[in-house]
Amino acid sequence: MTEFIPPGSLFHALSSPFAMKRGGQLHHARIAYETWGRLNASATNAILIMPGLSPNAHAAHHDSNAEPGWWESMLGPGKPIDTDRWFVICVNSLGSCKGSTGPASYNPITQAMYRLDFPALSIEDGANSAIEVVHALGIKQLASLIGNSMGGMTALAILLLHPDIARSHINISGSAQALPFSIAIRSLQREAIRLDPHWRQGDYDDTHYPESGLRIARKLGVITYRSALEWDGRFGRVRLDSDQTNDTPFGLEFQIENYLESHAHRFVHTFDPNCYLYLSRSMDWFDVAEYANGDILAGLARIRIQRALAIGSHTDILFPIQQQQQIAEGLRRGGTHATFLGLDSPQGHDAFLVDIARFGPPVKEFLDEL
């Protein structure tokens, strides 16, 4: 498979060699990013958005790409992240397949795809690469750093590794470390990919592609991204119409099964399996406690920013709400004016993407007060 790069992407050439936290280095690597709004003369109105595992840098439409982005309702003129006021940057994570260098990219030294020769990937690598983009744009300090899901982890790594890089922070459905439940789910996702006979130790192609493994991995993910409450409301126990079923033993029968199948089928043609493995494992490894002798609150207290907001959904089972509470508590211990907000959204972990009616107002209020 090839990379899936949105039109209108911008690229930053990383320092070469680019050292990786867990060993190894990249040569002539790049980070894909997109921007909205205008940077003011003093370069003090910049906001950096760090996305989750699967999104690209196309958070919203712009002149070079009119397609709606994955955070279209949150970002733009007059929206909660108001691009009439803010210069907004969104990067595609290092290790992804959406424009930034990752396992699906070609190694300039060997002229072959990295595949499993790509160095072990950490959240900190994504943090360091993103800040190179910020500095290249002439920005010394961000007005705010926003991270959601995996991006919430990356944002915390940025704040730990690059003191004074931001005046404020919004952490949305993020965490300071992976919990056992989340690690277990991601372990099953990776196993589904690796056990697909077409995976071939990462050496697949379009003819022999681990579609079944990636499809199952995505289904597991989607189940954890939403909540049982939402599934009940949307699908109940409604069965498919007779023309939607087939005679396959134990095949699709319920609408929820068909939804998962359709969602997964779309995903496998837009994401590289090896990239999925690398990014997934990087989340398992991340732990703020490593920065304070095993004390996660002390690790968070090492972060020095003026203001912070941690937001979560009460129905999130992948990044449960106590993890956002923990972020706010740890930041307060370090002297940050940090606020925690738990929202009653039925849409689980994905609520920040789809429930803008609940998540938008607190983001807008926080940024308006800066």
UniProtKB/Swiss-Prot annotation:
Major subcellular location class: cytoplasm
GO MF, one annotated term: homoserine O-acetyltransferase activity
Domain AB hydrolase-1: 45-354
CC terms in the record's Gene Ontology section: cytoplasm
Location within or outside the cell: Cytoplasm
Reaction catalysis annotation: succinyl-CoA + L-serine = O-succinyl-L-serine + CoA
Annotated site location: Important for acyl-CoA specificity: 186
Pathway named in the protein's UniProt entry: Amino-acid biosynthesis; L-cysteine biosynthesis; L-cysteine from L-serine: step 1/2
Alphabetical keyword list: Acyltransferase, Amino-acid biosynthesis, Cysteine biosynthesis, Cytoplasm, Transferase
Annotated spans, Important for substrate specificity: 52-55
Pfam families, sorted: Abhydrolase_1
Oxidoreductase listed as a keyword: no
PANTHER family: HOMOSERINE O-ACETYLTRANSFERASE (PTHR32268:SF11)
Record-stated family: Belongs to the AB hydrolase superfamily. MetX family.
Subunit organization: Homodimer.
Name listed for the protein in its UniProt record: Serine O-succinyltransferase
Origin organism lineage: Bacteria, Pseudomonadati, Pseudomonadota, Gammaproteobacteria, Lysobacterales
